[in-house]
């Protein structure tokens, strides 16, 4: 279903993101008492009165200042209005009409998009009507008093909004694969998003921390619909101050946790840092599918063997993700960027894959024939009876043995390696659960025909 879009527009610090959270009944938009917190355009779904729609939050719009990120923010607002079915101009009732409001109103009057004025910070219902009346002079119709913090007036505002929206274009809902672009600040995540999407979807700058929130972008490649999230750069905790970066990093970690696949971006010049290793550990810990993208490869002086030497060095430091595909790209030139989708889709498919118990046990049987389970000094030897896949996302196998303590880390790694060699699973972590089981209980299952033992006592 293609949803109509509402663009939230206004000066910096008038409460746009707070209003977005109120209308969407969420706290996904970062709210902080400082101008310029929102820079890129961010999307959230909402519903009211049985009608679904999409709200796009935009950065504070300023026409008479070109400092820092303001021109880029302006470009993002212009793009948001182009795709919107309705514009919601948010103004500050306590400040009254400002020159900035007048400039934005003039621009909106020249656009073809229907506009509704939401006069925010009207906590008093009675006083709010008086405060809102001043905004008639913007020439965009009746202003509506609301309080984004307390919620007063927002229900009436939503009633008005859904009355102005076109009917939803109902199509068969396509499954979306969620891909999160993860990495330290300034490794080229936003440049990669722009290269992937073919538009300037995110603001790019040499200044670390340009992206302060997680940005969602929908892209269709072949028959696959992707939801791509560019996340805020993640730094060491001691370097992160409470504020926009703190909230953005929390969003980034949440993006990892709910992703189908993570794209871990590494700077080819800097190599793998301690923070990159921690991010790799987080991805593995959460059981996410992953591919590793080495960006800025165009800046590396190389010969025919460089790529092999560099990959070996990088993998030695990213041992958490030994199962991940590694791709060397340039987000700036577009070199090998399209390969990301191919390998990400393979990783997702492996992450969701299920294998029949009979196939698992064939692999285990062969593995044991090549290398028997270890024997302790006491003379007691490990017995691997059988295994079965109990879940996917990530693929999880339970291996039933006589005593899990008899199987050390070396043999456990050997079994995982054999499963990967025989069954694949590139791009996804595997979880092997070693469970002790009594021979008597096993015999009953064998008698019922439920299982066939790989190894007997």
From Swiss-Prot:
Residues annotated as binding GTP 1: 10-17, 57-61, 120-123
InterPro entries per record: G_ENGA, GTP-bd, GTPase_Der, KH_dom-like, KH_dom-like_a/b, P-loop_NTPase, Small_GTP-bd
Protein's GO biological process: ribosome biogenesis
Domain EngA-type G stretches: 4-169, 177-352
Coiled coil (residue ranges): none
Keywords per UniProt: GTP-binding, Nucleotide-binding, Repeat, Ribosome biogenesis
MF-aspect GO terms: GTP binding; ribosome binding
Domain annotation KH-like: ranges: 353-438
Binding site for GTP 2: 183-190, 230-234, 295-298
Family: Belongs to the TRAFAC class TrmE-Era-EngA-EngB-Septin-like GTPase superfamily. EngA (Der) GTPase family.
NCBIfam families: GTPase_EngA, small_GTP
Subunit structure comment from the entry: Associates with the 50S ribosomal subunit.
HAMAP family according to UniProt: GTPase_Der
Biological role: GTPase that plays an essential role in the late steps of ribosome biogenesis.
Protein name per UniProt: GTPase Der
């Amino acid at each position: 279903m293609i949803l109509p879009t509402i663009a939230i527009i206004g000066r910096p610090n008038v409460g746009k993101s707070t209003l977005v959270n109120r209308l969407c009944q969420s706290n996904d938009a970062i709210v902080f008492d400082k101008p310029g917190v929102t820079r890129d355009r961010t999307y959230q779904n909402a519903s009211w009165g049985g009608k679904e729609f999409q709200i796009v939050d935009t950065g504070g719009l300023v026409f008479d200042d070109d400092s820092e990120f303001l021109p880029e923010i302006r470009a993002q607002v212009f793009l948001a209005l182009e795709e919107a079915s309705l514009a919601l101009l948010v103004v500050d009732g306590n400040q009254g009409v400002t020159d900035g409001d007048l400039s934005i109103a003039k621009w909106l009057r020249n656009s073809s998009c229907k506009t509704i004025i939401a006069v925010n910070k009207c906590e008093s219902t009675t006083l709010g009507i008086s405060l809102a009346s001043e905004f008639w002079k913007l020439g965009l119709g009746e202003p509506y008093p609301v309080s984004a913090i307390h919620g007063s007036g927002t229900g009436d505002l939503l009633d008005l909004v859904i009355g102005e929206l076109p009917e939803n274009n109902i199509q068969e809902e396509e499954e979306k694969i969620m891909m999160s672009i993860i990495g330290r600040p300034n490794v080229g995540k936003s440049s990669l998003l722009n290269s992937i999407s073919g538009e300037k979807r995110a603001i790019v700058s040499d200044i670390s921390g340009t992206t302060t929130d997680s940005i969602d972008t929908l892209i269709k490649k072949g028959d696959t619909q992707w939801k791509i999230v560019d996340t805020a750069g993640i730094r060491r905790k001691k370097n992160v101050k409470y504020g926009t970066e703190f909230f953005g990093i929390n969003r980034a970690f949440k993006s990892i946790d709910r992703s189908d696949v993570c794209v871990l971006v590494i700077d080819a010049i800097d190599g793998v840092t301690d923070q990159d290793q921690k991010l790799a550990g987080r991805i593995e810990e959460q059981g996410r599918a992953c591919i590793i993208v080495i960006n800025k490869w165009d800046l590396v002086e190389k010969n025919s063997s460089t790529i092999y030497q560099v990959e070996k060095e990088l993998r030695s430091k990213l041992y958490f993700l030994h199962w991940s595909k590694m791709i060397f790209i340039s987000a700036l030139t577009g070199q090998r960027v399209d390969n990301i989708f191919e390998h990400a889709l393979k990783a997702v498919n492996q992450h969701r894959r299920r294998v029949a118990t009979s196939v698992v046990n064939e692999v285990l049987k062969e593995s044991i024939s090549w290398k028997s389970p270890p024997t302790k000094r006491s003379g007691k030897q490990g017995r691997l009876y059988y295994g079965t896949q109990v879940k996917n996302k990530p693929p999880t196998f339970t291996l039933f043995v006589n005593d899990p303590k008899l199987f050390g880390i070396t043999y456990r790694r050997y079994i995982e390696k054999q499963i990967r060699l025989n069954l694949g699973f590139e791009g996804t972590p595997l979880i092997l659960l070693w469970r002790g089981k009594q021979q008597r209980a096993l015999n009953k299952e064998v008698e019922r025909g439920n299982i066939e033992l790989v190894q007997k006592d």
